[in-house]
A protein has these predicted regions:
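Low-complexity intrinsically disordered segments
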Residues: 76-119
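Exposed beta-strand and adjacent loop surfaces of beta-rich binding modules
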Residues: 41-43, 56, 83, 108
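Beta-strand elements of well-folded, non-transmembrane domains
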Residues: 48-50, 63-65, 117
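Terminal beta-strand-rich extracellular "head" domains
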Residues: 62-81
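Short, surface-exposed beta-strand/strand-loop-strand elements in extracellular ectodomains
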Residues: 54-63
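Surface-exposed ligand/attachment interfaces on beta-rich extracellular proteins
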Residues: 12-41, 49-53, 67, 102-106
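Low-complexity, small-hydrophobic/phenylalanine-enriched stretches
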Residues: 1-12, 44
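Residue-level recognition of well-ordered beta-strand positions that form the cores
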Residues: 6, 45-47, 60, 98-100, ...
Length: 119
């Protein structure tokens, strides 16, 4: 094994924004100051509420410091279609998790996040 792997505990966050279909919103940011802080993998558990509508899911994110890759899975929702789609990006040394409301989704969107990080 080369070097060390750091597995960070659960980080819990919540918030809300005014959703507009197709408009991306950053819901979590992890700073990668240098190679020692490079985020390798993040596992997210997410929950979204919009009125009586809700969605829960997992997202697995990996990063090489330049690009971010994400895979949504375990997606559950109580509406005809999911409320949001999730993707990860890297900008200004930050790993961002973004939620994009799907067609027809507008208004106040609440979110709850739990994450585990491997650096």
């Amino acid at each position: 094994m080369v070097g060390r792997i750091h597995i960070m505990g659960d980080t819990i966050n919540s918030g809300s924004w005014t959703a507009s279909a197709g408009t991306e919103q950053t819901i979590d940011t992890i700073t990668q100051a240098n190679n020692n802080q490079l985020v390798r993998t993040v596992e997210y558990t997410l929950h979204f509420n919009q009125g009586n509508n809700m969605q829960a899911q997992k997202v697995l994110v990996m990063s090489n410091g330049t690009n971010a890759f994400s895979q949504e899975y375990g997606i559950m929702f109580n509406t005809g279609t999911p409320l949001v789609s999730i993707a990860a990006t890297i900008a200004s040394n930050n790993l961002n998790l973004n939620a994009t409301p799907n067609t027809g989704v507008t208004g106040t969107m609440e979110y709850y996040i739990s994450r585990k990080t491997i650096r």
